[in-house]
Structure formats: structure tokens, C-alpha cells
């Protein structure tokens, strides 16, 4: 079995291994998955958080070891981005990555999330998994989705599925 984690802002998950195939979900930054099937240009993944299966373009898949996957899976130090959009910095590549609200920040401490050798700096607003979130903040976040356009499989205020 192979494993992966999204290192891109958002990756389209498709019904079939084909560019014109409908998008059925989106994988946000920091979400991890198991690779359950491979083709020349495509990999089929099973998302950890909801067990949803979809195809992603191989060039958008980032493989990690089983140990790294398990470390993410069992991490007690999670955070989630709650800014509409924010900037993350890939420390190893010195490059910026836009992060959408709901992006996962595994092993998050002191403004950085990490998996394996990969370290990302994040200065946006977060909610840490162990701290919970207030009712008021849930309502504030929900309001960011008001007037969001409908997008089949979408998972952000820039396009959301029902």
C-alpha cells in the first residue's frame, strides 16, 4: 500500500481516471490518503477523514511513507485554517501556497505544520484540534459560505457542494 498527502491548495478528485470526468470532491492542503490503485497518469485514493474514493492526476499526488502517514493519522496536534484564504510557505522550497479555509495543518506547532521532511509555515488564523471551537466561531465560519457558488464536489467558499 502507498500513501500520500496533499501539498497543493486544492486537488480535484474525479469519478473516473480522465480529465473530462466529473469532479466528485476536492482534496484540500494537508489532507492525507491511501493510494489504492495506480494507472499511468492517475492514482485512485481513499481519503482518511471520510473514506471517500476518487481519482487524482498523478502529478498532483505527493507520496509519503507509511510511517509519515501513520504519524499524521495519529497526530494529537492538528489545526485547521479558518481564514477564507491564507498563505502557507513551503520552507524547503521557499515557495508560497495559498491555503483555503478548512485546510489541514497536521503536527501543527509554533506556526508550522510538518510531515516527514516537509515543513510549512502558516501565519493565518487556525483552530487547534484540542481546543475545540466556539458556537460563535462556527457561525462566523458558516457565514463565509453564504452566497458561495454551487460546485459539484466543491469544498470551499469559492465553490461548495451540498
Predicted regions and their residues:
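Surface-exposed patches in mature extracellular/periplasmic domains of secreted proteins
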Residues: 150-154
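Intrinsically disordered, low-complexity polar regions and short flexible loop motifs
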Residues: 20
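OB/S1-fold single-stranded nucleic-acid-binding modules
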Residues: 7-9
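Boundary regions of SH3-family modules and the immediately adjacent low-complexity/disordered segments
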Residues: 1-3, 25, 29-34, 39-40, ...
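Active-site nucleophilic cysteine motif
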Residues: 156-162
